Amino acid sequence: MQMPKKFIITIVLLFAFSNNALAQFGFSHEVGVIVGPVAFQSDYGERYNFATNAGNTGYGIGLIHYLNFSYRADCNCYTPETYFNDHFKLRSELSYNKTDLQHFGRWVDPDRTSLFANQLRGMRGSTSVTNIGMQLEYFPLSIRDFSSTIGAWAPFISLGGQFSFYDPEAYSTLGPLNTPVSTPIKYYNATTNQGGTVWSIVGSVGTRYKLTELSDLMVDLRMQYYFSNWVDGLNPDPAVYVENRANDWNVWLNFGYIYYLQ
């Protein structure tokens, strides 16, 4: 499911309005971009298998915004010093990731020549996911001290939620799915090319580096757990195939640039 353009415009307008409203309280703002590789953990491949983890990877890009509670935009001065103001930021995000998927692991090793192995090798998939959400970031070290020290580091952890639009595709190089030629019994009627929406939990750990007075570099490693097993377009019956009972999730290594708005 592609996110409707009208919906994107509405979100952007609401986002701008909320930022303007929050600015009345003196919060300052930061904006940035992120990009990096995504490893998608799905029903394609073998669990806990390095080839699967390395093979089912894609890319992600995003726009991010922060509310900085330690600094006031209306007076270019620090806010009253409280623990929350000096150790927390609120991050908003609009991001997109895409991953091509296929089966890896022992069941598709070259020495396996059965029909089942050939069918697995022929299965292909992909998923594109657009995310909108927020995370609360906690900095154990002082945000004020970091902001005033070029070359400083600011490690953080975060937790939040996102609403996602996913658009999967599943097919086989052997022909149409759900036929004895192309599809293992396990995956009969277990695929879809129909998109949908899903909520997810996002957690990350990372650090910032103070590049200049008004800019930071950032790296973070995050995990996103979806409350659905259809994000990849593949979902064999979990009551029968317990190895596929887990919902879809991904790991994203972000590299970012952040600019402080005055």
Where are these regions (language model features)?
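Residues that define the transmembrane beta-barrel architecture of outer-membrane proteins
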Residues: 27, 53-59, 86, 128-132, ...
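Residue-level detector of the transmembrane beta-barrel scaffold of outer-membrane proteins
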Residues: 30-32, 89-91, 156-158, 216-218, ...
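Extracellular/periplasm-exposed beta-strand and loop segments of Gram-negative cell-envelope proteins
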Residues: 46-52, 99-131, 166-198, 230-250
